[in-house]
């Protein structure tokens, strides 16, 4: 299948969203040296992609879906759209991308009132969507280290859990010259998520405070020391996460008319990447219409919602102090990618209309109820997946989505990462600051069949019979 291997290479530059300054892509840059704003990466030769027809691009990407070439099996199936400067030998693949889109169970679909599906990004290698961006960021670092013969590069990130798990996993796989350090807000990462960077051998540091505090520390490091920052300020990560848009379009046979995407905002990197990806597809004619994109935020961390809720001429950006949220990955009061969101949302609305991009607010109670309801119907949604379902329900109630449309919800991580919140719900143990009261219809707890002493007091046959009888009575079974 050598005919599917990329032959087109490009030149790339960092483009500052503040002063429009440009810098070469072969350097570790995260913010503009001139004005301090964030970057987007741009392929200077992007116009050359128009030399191939939209139909040919679709056919090529469909052919690559069957490829056994390692460099094309993950997010780099869309190599020319992502990072066409990289060499195949540097591309890192751990099984990321190409995550399943699972239609809502019929009973759940009927409850909600329109056709929708989950894209299960929790089925990435580290069990979250972050692997899309890390695959690109680490491929770039391999390429850069090889070009410069660097002997050691420290990769650093602040995290609420998923970023650290992903960064540590990819650093462990690549190995020298890369080493991983992660900084976490003490006590605000689930035990399941904490176990991941520890298991991958990263240096794990904890800091009192919240994610925003950790972010300021690693930003200071990146500005004053030669380290590789792996948060979404890293523009290479945004490129890898664009693959979500490309996969979504390809799965729907490049027809995204009447499709509404619901995406948790968090640090705003993912919604940035998805808009950027669809804008590229639209510019090249691979999709004829843009899907509508709804960012979703909890009322406990909703700066982007507040910005867009204001009249257009009265909007001012204002970070917020976050309150505890079960959607931990989205519990960010000052998302670093907001300047990208604002810039790309302008372009997205210009191309798709005023209703093409909107932000929805949800309550913590709605997030937990929606997550449990989804998983009660056979899904594996995390709290962010619950946030998206709650956003869909609210959008329907507000008349922002019609029942003739279809929706795709982003389950950013695997539900097992948030088993602790499920346990708090089932045992009614949430602290008052969350504002969550369990719905008895969604709560679930194990029931004891026999007292613990029964195992030692009864012979095997009697023990089995007594347990079976207790089970039959509990389940109201009728004898044959």
Language-model region placement:
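N-terminal juxtadomain amphipathic helix
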Residues: 2-93
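Short glycine/serine/threonine-rich phosphate/pyrophosphate-binding segments
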Residues: 131-137, 156-174, 190-192, 267-274, ...
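Active-site/ligand-binding-proximal alpha/beta "capping" segment
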Residues: 221-285, 368-373
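Alpha-helix C-terminal capping segments
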Residues: 139-147, 165-177, 279, 390-400
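Active-site/ligand-binding loops adjacent to catalytic centers
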Residues: 98, 193-195, 205, 209-229, ...
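A short, small-residue-rich loop immediately preceding and capping a beta-strand
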Residues: 147-170, 177-185, 257-267, 293, ...
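Claisen-condensing/thiolase-fold acyl-transfer catalytic domains that form or cleave C-C bonds
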Residues: 263, 364-421
């Amino acid at each position: 299948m050598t005919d599917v291997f990329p032959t087109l290479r490009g030149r790339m530059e960092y483009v500052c969203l503040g002063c429009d300054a440009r810098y070469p892509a072969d350097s570790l840059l995260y913010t503009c040296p001139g004005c301090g704003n964030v970057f987007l990466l741009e392929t200077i030769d992007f116009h050359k992609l128009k030399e191939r027809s939209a139909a040919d691009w679709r056919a090529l990407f469909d052919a690559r879906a069957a490829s056994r070439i390692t460099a094309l099996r993950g997010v780099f199936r869309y190599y020319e759209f992502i990072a066409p400067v990289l060499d195949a030998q540097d591309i890192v693949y751990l099984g990321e991308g190409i995550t399943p889109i699972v239609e809502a169970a019929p009973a759940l679909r009927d409850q909600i009132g329109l056709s929708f599906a989950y894209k299960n990004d929790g089925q990435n290698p580290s069990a979250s969507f972050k692997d899309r961006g890390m695959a690109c960021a680490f491929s770039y670092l391999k390429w850069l280290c090889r070009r410069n013969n660097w002997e050691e590069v420290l990769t650093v990130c602040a995290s609420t859990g998923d970023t650290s798990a992903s960064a540590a996993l990819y650093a462990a796989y690549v190995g020298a010259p890369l080493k991983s350090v992660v900084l976490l807000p003490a006590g605000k990462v689930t035990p399941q998520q904490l176990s991941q960077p520890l298991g991958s051998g990263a240096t794990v540091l904890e800091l009192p405070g919240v994610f925003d505090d950790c972010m300021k520390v690693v930003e200071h490091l990146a500005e004053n020391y030669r380290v590789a920052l792996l948060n979404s300020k890293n523009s290479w990560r945004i490129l890898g996460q664009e693959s979500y848009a490309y996969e979504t379009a390809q799965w729907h046979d490049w027809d995204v008319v009447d499709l509404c995407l619901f995406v948790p905002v968090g640090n705003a990197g993912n919604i940035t990447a998805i808009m950027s990806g669809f804008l590229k597809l639209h510019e090249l004619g691979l999709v004829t219409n843009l899907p509508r994109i709804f960012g979703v935020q909890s009322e406990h961390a909703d700066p982007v919602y507040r910005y867009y809720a204001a009249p257009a001429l009265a909007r001012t950006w204002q970070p917020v102090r976050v309150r505890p949220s079960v959607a931990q990955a989205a519990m960010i009061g000052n998302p670093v990618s907001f300047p990208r969101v604002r810039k790309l949302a302008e372009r997205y609305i210009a191309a798709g209309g005023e209703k093409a991009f909107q932000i929805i607010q949800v309550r913590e109670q709605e997030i937990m109820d929606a997550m449990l309801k989804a998983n009660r119907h056979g899904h594996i949604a995390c709290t962010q997946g619950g946030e998206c379902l709650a956003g869909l329900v609210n959008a329907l109630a507000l008349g922002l989505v019609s029942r003739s449309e279809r929706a795709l919800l982003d389950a950013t991580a695997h539900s097992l990462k948030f088993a602790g919140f499920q346990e708090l719900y089932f045992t009614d143990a949430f602290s008052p600051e969350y504002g969550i009261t369990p719905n008895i219809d969604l709560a679930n707890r194990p029931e004891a069949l026999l007292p613990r002493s029964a195992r030692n007091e009864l012979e095997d046959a009697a023990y089995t019979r007594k347990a079976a009888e207790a089970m039959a009575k509990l389940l109201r079974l009728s004898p044959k």
